[in-house]
Amino acid sequence: MTRRELRTRSPNPQRMTAPPPRDAFRPKEWEIIQKYRTPRQVQQFLRSLPYNWEKDGETLRTFRGVIENWSVHCLEAALAAAAILEQHGYPPLLLDFESQDKLDHVLFLFRQHGRWGTVARSRDAGLHGRKPMFSTLRKLVMSYVDP
């Protein structure tokens, strides 16, 4: 996707592929998908889950793994948000950036009313999601520089 396409696309662009069908999800997963329909609701849901400190070794859980284990770290949260919100018309866009100390942070990226926002989970509350108030991706990313 080009920068121009990202700037001009609506929050529900025509999809190149359809989201997974309902029967791809287990009943508990589908219940969560139906309960949390907006980025704000998904952000609240992810904040309610314990942080996955990976005490037994590194993990990379899918949405299913997050629901089974009921904990989440930043990448897992972004994947879970994408799985949930794709069912409600949001493209599954992830944004990954790396700090100077080589720590990555991954967020689910969305647009509402022409403004960019994120859904995110972190050990640091300053790195959680952002409301859709940023006119450009650069402004959104810069909001994470010194939270």
Positions of PLM-derived features:
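A structural boundary/capping signal
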Residues: 2-147
